[in-house]
Amino acid sequence: MSATIIGKVKSGGRKDYDVKWDSSSKEVYVSWGGWTGVGKASSAADAMRRAEAWLYNK
C-alpha cells in the first residue's frame, strides 16, 4: 500500500504542509521540500502529532 495524505499541519512559521502516512510501513512524510520522511507512527493520529512536532522549528 502507498502513503496517503491524511491532513495538514502548520509549521512554526504558520505555513500549512500536507502529511502522508503509509499504514503498512508506518512511515510519515511531510510536504517540506518535496516529500520528506520524518519517522514512523503507529496510527494516523500519531503521524499527525509527529509531523507537527517535526515542523515546529521549520
Model-derived features: positions:
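Short N-terminal "domain-start" leader segments
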Residues: 1-27
